Amino acid sequence: MKQKTHKGTAKRIKVTGSGKLRREQANRRHLLEGKPSKRTRRLKGTEDVAKADTKRVKRLLGRA
């Protein structure tokens, strides 16, 4: 039977053309009034998935 893509992971992580895994930063959804502007600016954009997690994430995405 074919392996299914883990949809929760697929919604959160994008694969770049070179095969890198990118994810959104945490802590920027709500309760932003109490966080300094400096912190919220730093949390903009995307970040690479941790090296320790890449193998597991690729398997969930069906790219292992």
Curated annotation (Swiss-Prot):
Residues 21-36 have a biased composition (Basic and acidic residues). Residues 1-14 have a biased composition (Basic residues). Keywords: Ribonucleoprotein, Ribosomal protein. The keyword Zinc does not apply. GO terms for biological process: translation. SUPFAM superfamilies: L35p-like. It comes from the Bacteria. Pfam families: Ribosomal_L35p (PF01632). One of its GO terms (cellular component) is cytosolic large ribosomal subunit. Residues 1-48 are annotated as: Disordered. One of its GO terms (molecular function) is structural constituent of ribosome. The keyword Transport does not apply. NCBIfam families: rpmI_bact. Belongs to the bacterial ribosomal protein bL35 family. HAMAP family: Ribosomal_bL35. This is Large ribosomal subunit protein bL35. It comes from Corynebacterium aurimucosum (strain ATCC 700975 / DSM 44827 / CIP 107346 / CN-1).
